[in-house]
């Protein structure tokens, strides 16, 4: 095999890899940039309910039937209202609206067709008030939390009719403040984010918000960082995982102590990792989604990375380039064998199997395989006495 042929084959393989990465992220065609952030504290989210995907957009609540590939998006409620999140109780929906200075919470009894404002009173500095995020109790639909710039974390046990303050503190950056309940231990509440001097933190209450423990430098990454939305192992409730700025945080003792995997020096694993999720069927498989802004000659991009050992190590990320300066990831969910990524540009569907296959594929010389290893072409057909070209041997792409 001469040098020119080798170079041609390698270029073809690189082109094949780039094309495969582009095809991995399948846009669901929302039709408008509904995920665009409306301001510094805007965090639009999405939810999977049965076979339906509900997405909070700048123009209201939209839904898509995930069981039908060609289903159209439908506006289902809160038309023209910039939404960040919602909680559902039967036909009742409590929606978190993006706004400045008031009118944050909207209650509907008919799925969002009509609604009334139920925002609690804002005693002081109303013009500075924001409600960045909302969290629903995993088993009690009447119980939920919202975060408030001026009042801290508020708890309601009657679906938003009345509120009490759990703590007056939330982290300083409203665009990266996350609150929630532990899904298996809902008496555990967290507030993660970024402090006043940009250090990463997570505050945890183990007694339903009565007392709080702060974890900052103990996370293993002192200095400029942020702890984004935590996720929880489905069968080991002591294991939590959260993305950071170029790193991944992991705990195996219910949030008491943390370790940090720092990937800032590794281009294949570095990103602002915002959302992560354990696989429903294979709990030691974890997915994490993030993004990078435009830098020099490189455009903005969305990144997706996976781990098959519970988050202790990660395969190189798969990348989708974007025309946007910064295509921020708003949320990550799963539906069966697919991941759903909500970014500022669209909602994307990604096959879990294809993601893992592309992440674990490596290029190596055929001489490292045994003579008994069968070769397949790129269409999956077995090849006897393969000639010069690109083949799949032992589940890896090989240049021969």
Task: Label each residue range with its predicted role.
Residues 20-69, 73:
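An edge-strand/N-cap motif at the start of beta-rich repeat modules
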Residues 51-55, 91-95, 140-146, 185-191, ...:
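Entry beta-strands of beta-propeller and related beta-repeat scaffolds
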Residues 63-67, 108-109, 138, 156-157, ...:
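Conserved Ser/Thr-centered positions that define the repeating blades of beta-propeller domains
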Residues 350-381:
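Residue-level detector of functionally pivotal "anchor" positions at catalytic/ligand-binding pockets or at interdomain
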């Amino acid at each position: 095999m001469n040098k020119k042929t080798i170079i041609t084959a390698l270029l073809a393989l690189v082109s094949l890899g780039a094309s495969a990465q582009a095809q991995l992220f399948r846009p669901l065609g929302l039709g408008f940039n509904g995920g665009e952030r409306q301001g510094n504290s805007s965090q639009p989210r999405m939810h999977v309910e049965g076979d339906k995907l509900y997405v909070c957009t700048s123009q209201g609540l939209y839904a898509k039937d995930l069981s039908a590939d060609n289903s159209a998006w439908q506006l289902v409620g809160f038309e023209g209202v910039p939404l960040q999140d919602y909680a559902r109780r039967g036909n009742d929906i409590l929606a978190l609206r993006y706004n400045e200075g008031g009118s944050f919470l909207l209650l509907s009894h008919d799925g969002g067709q009509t609604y009334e404002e139920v925002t609690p009173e804002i005693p002081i500095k109303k013009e500075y008030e924001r409600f960045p995020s909302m969290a629903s109790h995993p088993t009690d639909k009447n119980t939920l939390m919202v975060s408030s710039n001026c009042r801290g974390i508020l708890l309601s046990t009657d679906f938003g009719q009345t509120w009490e303050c759990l703590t007056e503190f939330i982290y300083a950056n409203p665009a990266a403040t996350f609150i929630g309940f532990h899904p298996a231990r809902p008496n555990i509440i967290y507030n993660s984010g970024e402090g006043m001097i940009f250090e990463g933190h997570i505050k945890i209450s183990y007694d339903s918000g009565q007392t709080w423990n702060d974890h900052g430098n103990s996370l293993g990454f002192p200095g400029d960082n942020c702890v984004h939305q935590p996720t929880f192992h489905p069968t080991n409730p002591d294991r939590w995982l959260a993305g950071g700025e170029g790193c991944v945080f992991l705990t195996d003792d219910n949030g008491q102590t943390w370790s940090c995997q720092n990937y800032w020096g590794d281009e294949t694993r570095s990103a602002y990792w915002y959302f992560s999720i354990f696989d429903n069927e294979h709990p030691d498989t974890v997915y994490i989604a993030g993004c990078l802004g435009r830098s020099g000659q490189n455009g903005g991009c969305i990144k997706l990375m996976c781990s098959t050992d519970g988050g202790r190590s990660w395969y190189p990320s798969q990348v989708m380039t974007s025309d946007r300066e910064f295509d921020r990831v708003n949320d990550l969910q799963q539906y069966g064998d697919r991941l759903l990524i909500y970014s500022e540009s669209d909602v994307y569907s990604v096959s879990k199997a294809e993601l893992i296959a592309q992440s674990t594929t490596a290029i190596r010389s055929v001489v490292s395989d045994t003579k008994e290893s069968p070769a397949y072409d790129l269409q999956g057909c077995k090849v006897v006495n393969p000639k010069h070209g690109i083949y799949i041997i032992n589940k890896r792409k090989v240049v021969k």
